[in-house]
């Protein structure tokens, strides 16, 4: 749901550093910033589709306190996604599961390397004018708010997780939507533990 004020922080203002305040940025999922990549997507086979990608990795091991500080990666970030769509009882179902992995090091050998890995999953169901979507993620060593680790926080192998629930009903030219998202983090994104939640309701007329 792209309306609403979005998630805010007492110290940072908007979690995305003062950018747009779309409804659930910062809660429920790491915002997927564009990145250089080579991705293969298979044809849809009986509703099943597989994607595999090699991505430009991001710095996660910056340590400004070290004179030798320089984050680097030996290999790209790997991502994959499996989607499956089908119909049952008159409802259209779209489901997905995805994952990522990357490792970041530092030229200062005293700075621990970070092995980042995560998994995401979700399902969407549509029937008549109703639409319901539920998704979530669990990860270790990632920035739980934005995939490019904006601000280059020094990350650690600590956990984060979140979920996003959205539902809507369309009748005529009208649509009513509800949304609720939550992200919990042990301290990677902001340096201290975070527990953010956003709820929203919207009315659209086209």
Where are these regions (language model features)?
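A short secondary-structure junction signal
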Residues: 51-53, 61-65, 108-109, 146
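Glycine- and other small-residue-rich loops at beta-strand/loop junctions that grip anionic moieties
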Residues: 29, 71, 156
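Solvent-exposed, low-complexity segments and loops of surface/extracellular structural proteins
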Residues: 65-69, 192
């Amino acid at each position: 749901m792209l309306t609403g004020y979005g998630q805010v922080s007492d110290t940072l203002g908007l979690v995305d550093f003062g950018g747009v305040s779309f409804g659930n940025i910062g809660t429920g999922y790491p915002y997927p910033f564009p990145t250089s990549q080579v991705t293969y997507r298979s044809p849809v086979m009986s509703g099943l589709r597989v994607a595999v990608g090699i991505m430009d990795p991001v710095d996660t091991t910056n340590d400004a306190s070290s004179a030798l500080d320089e984050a680097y990666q030996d290999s790209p970030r790997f991502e994959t996604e499996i989607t499956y769509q089908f119909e049952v009882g008159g409802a259209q179902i779209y489901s997905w599961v995805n994952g990522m992995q990357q490792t970041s090091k530092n030229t200062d050998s005293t700075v621990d390397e970070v092995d980042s890995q995560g998994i995401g999953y979700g399902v969407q169901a549509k029937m008549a004018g109703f639409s319901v979507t539920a998704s979530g993620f669990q990860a270790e060593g990632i920035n739980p708010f934005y995939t490019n680790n904006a601000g280059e926080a020094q990350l650690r192998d600590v956990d984060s997780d979140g979920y996003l629930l959205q539902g809507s009903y369309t009748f005529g030219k009208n649509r009513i939507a509800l949304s609720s998202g939550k992200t919990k983090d042990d301290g990677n994104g902001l340096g201290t533990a975070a527990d953010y939640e956003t709820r929203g309701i919207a009315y659209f007329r086209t």
